[in-house]
A protein has these predicted regions:
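Generic recognition of well-ordered alpha-helical segments
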Residues: 21-24, 51, 101, 107-108, ...
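Flexible, glycine/charged-enriched surface loops at secondary-structure junctions
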Residues: 62, 140-148
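A non-catalytic, amphipathic alpha-helix used as a structural packing/dimerization or gating element
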Residues: 43, 47, 51, 125, ...
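Short, glycine- and charge-enriched coil/turn segments that flank and shape catalytic ligand pockets
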Residues: 36, 121-123, 142
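C-terminal cap of metal-dependent C-N hydrolases
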Residues: 70-127
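Conserved NTP-handling cores and scaffolds of large molecular machines
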Residues: 26-29, 137, 141
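His/Asp/Glu-enriched, well-ordered alpha-helical/loop segment
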Residues: 1-83, 95-98
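C-terminal regulatory/interaction regions
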Residues: 124-128, 132, 145-178
């Protein structure tokens, strides 16, 4: 069974990106089995491209660079430290890169990142607006924290009770079977 990777959401972490998703795919099996397995850097790249496209029913449109496909691609600057000296595209992309080397991104052939900067958004204006809104955001977040404090104990208790129910498998990654 193939594993598809994607990272087009913010519910996991504001810093999530496809490079970190590929790295985690390679590293997580190591916490459950000390023996090398089938998940390596080349497979992680496949999971993030071809398998990801297939999983969402778009393998005829995206996931590969060939005629007739959408021109969705990322160009990396190989002069960045993650790629010096260059020796393995797959290993260096998966285990060394975190996004710093992204120079250009094309979506449907249209540039959305140029020279490492967003081409579709005024980054300076966005940063200024975020700074302007930050005090109100912090105030609202603090008010929510205070308001929700009374919910913490009942929610934790409900969660603990739910975890007592057997699902027929161990929920914890890394715990060796006894």
């Amino acid at each position: 069974m193939d594993i598809a990777l994607g990272c087009d959401n913010y519910s996991c972490a504001e810093t999530q990106n496809i490079f970190l998703a590929m790295r985690m795919l390679c590293l997580l099996p190591a916490v459950t089995d000390p023996e090398p397995g089938p998940v390596n850097a080349a497979y992680a790249l496949k999971a993030a491209t071809l398998v990801g496209a297939r999983a969402v029913g778009l393998s005829d449109k995206i996931g590969a660079l060939k005629p007739g496909m959408a021109a969705d691609l990322m160009i990396l600057d190989l002069k960045e430290p993650a790629f010096v000296p260059f020796n393995s595209a797959a290993r260096q992309i998966v285990f060394s890169e975190a996004g710093r080397a992204v120079d250009t991104v094309l979506v449907g052939g249209r540039p959305v990142v140029r020279n490492g900067k967003l081409a579709t958004v005024d980054e300076a204006a966005l940063a200024a607006e975020a700074e302007e809104l930050a005090p109100a955001f912090r105030r609202d977040a603090q008010a929510l924290t205070v308001r929700n404090a009374e919910l913490i104990t009942p929610l934790l208790n409900a969660n603990r009770e739910a975890w007592k129910v057997s699902l027929g498998f161990d929920r914890y990654i890394g715990r060796r079977p006894s």
